[in-house]
Amino acid sequence: MSKEGSLDAPIRHPIDFEHPDFLNPEKLDAEMRRAFDICHGCRRCFNLCDSFPKLFDMIDESENEDVESLKSEQFEPVVDACTLCDMCFMTKCPYVPPHDFDLDFPHLMLRYRTAQKKLGKLPGVPTQLAQIDRNAKIGVMFSKLVNWASDIKNKFLRKILEIVVGIDKRVQLPKYNSETFSNFFKKNKDKINFETPNKNRKVVIYTTCFVNFNKKNTGVAALKVLKKNGVEVQEAYPGCCGMPFLEQADLPKVVEQAKKVSKDLLEWVDKGYKVITLTASCGLMLKFEWPLLLPKDENIQRLSSNVMDIDEYVVDIANNEGLAEGLQEIDGGVTVHNACHARAQNMGIKSRDMLKFIPNVKLDVVERCAGHGGTFGVMKDTHDLANKVGRPTARQIKNKNNKYMASDCPLAGKHLKQLEIDTNISNDEALHPIELMAKSYKL
């Protein structure tokens, strides 16, 4: 007998993308219609991403106002509007497994997108942008030139970039580091020493592509805070976690990255190290998406149980041995943006829990999607839609009237800060929560 949903913890089934039925056109179409019919009868998710308003409008405007009246080609705009944020699955849908309806909307969109990719229907530019390691190595090597050419103030070159590549000229693109965090770590790890008693804790920072190539300061802050708290720190970056490939439905490539990266990280796990991630999306991949794509790979399963988010890890220190003394007040309140891929990890709001240890800090939390969704927020075809989704979130942040905004997702933070600038809120850079901890420690 079926029972009302949202009463049990949601579970996710493995993504069996190699099964013949996964890309079977008839079975995929039938599953899309089944899912859409359930969504049509519920509509609890109407105020999330634009996939649902598009779906409901199409149904309401159809001949018989039902899913069966829709043509299969009408499904594509619904799929295209999904950013794989997972918020419908994690926070809204009452029919996710273990409910009998067994609905996982984001992974169904991923399945449909995989079928599109097989048919050559996905645009080529985002697929090339997903080659993070290749692209970013060039970006770091020629960082001054690339940062100048891609700057939003360089209107001539940005217009050319928009015409040729399709990247919206209005988007503030991430800047490249002049050196990778990996190189910084090798040169400076022994110089950063606070003579703190060792806590018998060992971690390896999985740097993540964004920190390694674009936001070194986050890695530096994490290194200093961990060392301040008596943690032995190592660093590893064998390659990107594969999230950009997941967004482009290149599942074999995600699996390839998972096997490559996990092999390196497991060597540290076998030596007693915990793996620490510095961005929410990468933590989600290592903890959840990799095990779903490779459910029979014992190494992947073992790695996932030894991965922690940096905020999660610092809170764990605080709850056990206690944090090192020296945290001081910071000059202004903090609005924490609890990013979608942090929420999808089901670990609570660890960024807020960590920042609570800053003396007398004013903390506010905004739990709403930024709308960026990887390349979704930068491409001309989808940038306006990303702004539509993110603008209410930026408005909430504005209304909190705090000096700092912190997010575990660097792209979400960048996107929201640009929306803030557009509404004359602030020109300050969005920070990772660990950077505020370093600031409080005066590191």
Residue ranges of predicted features:
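Short, glycine/acidic-rich beta->alpha junctions
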Residues: 27-31, 74, 256-257, 389
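A generic structural-conservation signal
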Residues: 48, 58, 91-92, 235, ...
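Non-heme iron-sulfur electron-transfer modules
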Residues: 4-21, 47-83, 95-125, 425-436
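Cysteine-centered iron-sulfur cluster-binding motifs in ferredoxin-type domains/subunits
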Residues: 33-52, 74-100, 112, 136-139, ...
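A structural signal for alpha-helical segments
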Residues: 27, 70-73, 100, 298, ...
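Asp/Glu-centered strand-loop micro-motifs enriched in Gly/Pro and often flanked by an aromatic residue
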Residues: 16-40, 67-70
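Iron-sulfur cluster-binding electron-transfer modules in prokaryotic oxidoreductases
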Residues: 103-443
